[in-house]
A protein has these predicted regions:
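Helix-breaking motifs and short loop linkers at transmembrane-helix boundaries and internal kinks
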Residues: 34, 66, 88-93
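Residue-level signature of mid-helix packing/kink "hotspots" within the transmembrane helices
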Residues: 48-56, 144, 148
Length: 151
């Protein structure tokens, strides 16, 4: 399988994960778990917290100690464990911490996916400016497919 197809699959799955819960989680927390609006908002605010803190820290880790591909895989496995735990949460505190931990490990994967893609394209002597946008658009398609599958 060519590098472009492998990167298409990676980008598709990267955003499929996010699309599988981002839009439907609020309705689930309000309708099924009966969380209040402020609680739902606080859980979604963890995305901003994680976005501010973690990409820089994981960038340092990826630059100094662990290569980006390995760190990317580790973070996704940790995120899967957090999402599995979140699926069992029935109260606000457990859901809040599960989603905070999930987003602390998921948000850095957005930039790591780009790093992995750029490095792979460069290694295979591809034109990043020309070849990456059609690959990245499959992330958006993955997000949309996940929303359709879940809702």
């Amino acid at each position: 399988m060519s590098i472009k197809y492998r990167l298409i699959i990676m980008n598709f799955l990267q955003f499929f994960v996010w699309g599988s819960w981002l839009i439907s989680l609020g309705g689930y927390m309000g309708g099924v778990l009966h969380f209040e609006g402020g609680q739902i908002g606080a859980i979604f605010a963890t995305m901003g917290i994680a976005s501010l803190i973690m990409p820089g820290l994981t960038g340092i880790i990826a630059d100094k100690w662990v290569n980006a591909e390995r760190l990317y895989g580790i973070l996704h496995l940790l995120g899967a464990a957090c999402l599995f735990y979140a699926s069992t949460a029935t109260d606000y505190n457990h859901m809040y911490w599960a989603m905070l931990l999930n987003l602390l490990v998921y948000m850095p994967t957005l930039s790591l996916a780009n790093t992995v893609s750029y490095n792979a394209l460069e290694q295979y002597k591809c034109d990043i400016v020309k070849d990456f946008p059609p690959i990245r658009v499959w992330g958006t398609i993955g997000f949309i497919c996940a929303m359709w599958a879940v809702d």
